[in-house]
Design a protein with these regions (language model features):
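Pre-Walker A adenine-sensing motif
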Residues: 90-105
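A short, compositionally biased
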Residues: 4-8, 54-59, 97-99
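Glycine-rich, often acidic-flanked micro-motifs
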Residues: 2-10, 16-30, 101-114, 129-236, ...
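Short polybasic amphipathic segments
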Residues: 9-11, 58-64, 141
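N-terminal "assembly arms/tails" that initiate or stabilize quaternary assembly
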Residues: 33-40
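Conserved lysine of the Walker
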Residues: 120
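Charged, amphipathic alpha-helical linker segments immediately N-terminal to NTP-binding catalytic cores
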Residues: 42-87
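Post-Walker A alpha-helix
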Residues: 123-124
């Protein structure tokens, strides 16, 4: 195996964790569109090292701390993002990192939690375009020592079709991640703020599930649909695969046989694919023609929702204790206004998040 020609090593710091990546120049330039704000010009030992090497048939080998995996070249950035989220962010000890957007609204921190596809980036783009201060559309970084919400200036990765919802021309560089995205930078060096509001975004459910029917939705990065035949064989019955009505690489799978998550992941992996997203219900992206639906949350309900989106929960439970984590989160949320929101019309949803 030979290292890819014209490669370069770059060093990145994510709080108390560091990452070295060695990539071809073109891939490194793309990676820096997303994570350039975290790059350091230092020659220091890294927590994790990733090296990209040439293979055959247009594929490459990614070596992550001595563990290798062969992937398609166009999937390198997807795998790198997976490494960052599951091995770097998950190991951060100085901050609590949530899968959430973070805004600074008049000096007050707003954390907007929700799974991928619920509109965190769309809402954040609308907030930034209208003159608001977006600290992150993807990671809300909480400093428990200072009790402050800090900025996480990874650039926003925006679907080109999203620009039709905001008063903004799509003039940004493109990058192919799970799908083609426009890369919109965030301001660096933003001030930390106290957390005053927590919003948990929820799905609008689509099709009902028939009695005895198993349904799931998956987002798969794969060269073909071989994983579908592998999944049908693995569950021992016919599985109906329909392109999700929202598109974006998602499939809706229905079967009269149970579809265990591990069986699904195995079928995708052995077929050379990569599981990006997974739901157990028939869900739809936000409908921007309807009004948002708001539901006040008790502190207990807010704590449950917030903990489910904490990327480094295991690290905090191991380093401190589950009781410490629960107590700290409960204390923080007890002074914040917490509510659930099924997003609707964009400007209206943005406004209620700011003012409700």
């Amino acid at each position: 195996m030979r290292e890819t020609q014209k490669s370069m090593t770059a060093h990145y710091r994510f709080y108390d964790r560091t990452l070295d990546v060695r990539l071809p120049h073109d891939l490194l330039r793309q990676w820096d569109l997303l994570y350039g704000a975290f790059r350091e010009e230092l020659d220091a030992p890294a927590s994790i090292t990733v090296v990209c090497s040439e293979s055959d048939n247009g594929r490459v080998v990614l070596d992550v701390d001595g563990r290798s995996r062969k992937v398609a070249r166009e999937s390198v950035l997807i795998y790198l993002q997976d490494v960052v989220q599951n091995q770097v962010f998950a190991a951060v000890r100085t901050h609590m990192l949530w899968h959430a957007a973070a805004w600074n609204v008049n000096g007050n921190g707003v954390m907007i939690l929700g799974e991928s596809g619920l509109g965190k980036t769309t809402l954040s783009l609308a907030e930034q375009v209208s003159g608001g201060c977006v600290m992150s559309d993807e990671i809300a970084a909480w400093n428990p020592e200072k009790n402050l919400l800090e900025s996480f200036p990874r650039a926003m990765a925006v679907r080109p079709t999203t620009f039709m919802f905001v008063d903004e021309t799509e003039r940004y560089p493109r990058l192919h991640l799970d799908e083609e995205k426009a890369i919109v930078p965030l301001a660096r060096g933003q001030a930390a703020v106290p957390l005053r509001k927590v919003v948990i975004l929820g799905w609008a459910l689509d099709e009902p599930v028939a009695s005895g029917e198993s349904i799931c939705e998956v987002n798969v990065s794969a060269a073909d649909t071989q994983w579908q035949a592998a999944l049908s064989e693995a569950v021992g019955g016919d599985v109906v695969f329909n392109v999700h009505p929202d598109g974006g690489g998602w499939w809706r799978c229905r079967s009269l046989q149970p579809i265990p998550t591990l069986v699904l992941e195995s079928a995708i992996t052995v077929s050379g694919g990569f599981l990006i997203g997974f739901h157990r219900e028939a869900r739809r992206r936000p409908d921007y023609s309807r009004s948002p639906v708001l539901t006040p949350l008790s502190t207990d309900d807010a704590v449950k929702g917030v903990l489910s989106e904490l990327l480094n929960a295991r690290q905090w439970m191991d380093a401190e204790s589950p009781a410490y984590l629960l107590g700290h989160v409960r204390s923080v949320l007890s002074t914040a206004h917490c509510f659930a929101c099924v997003p609707g019309r964009l400007a209206e949803t943005q406004e209620v998040i700011r003012l409700y």
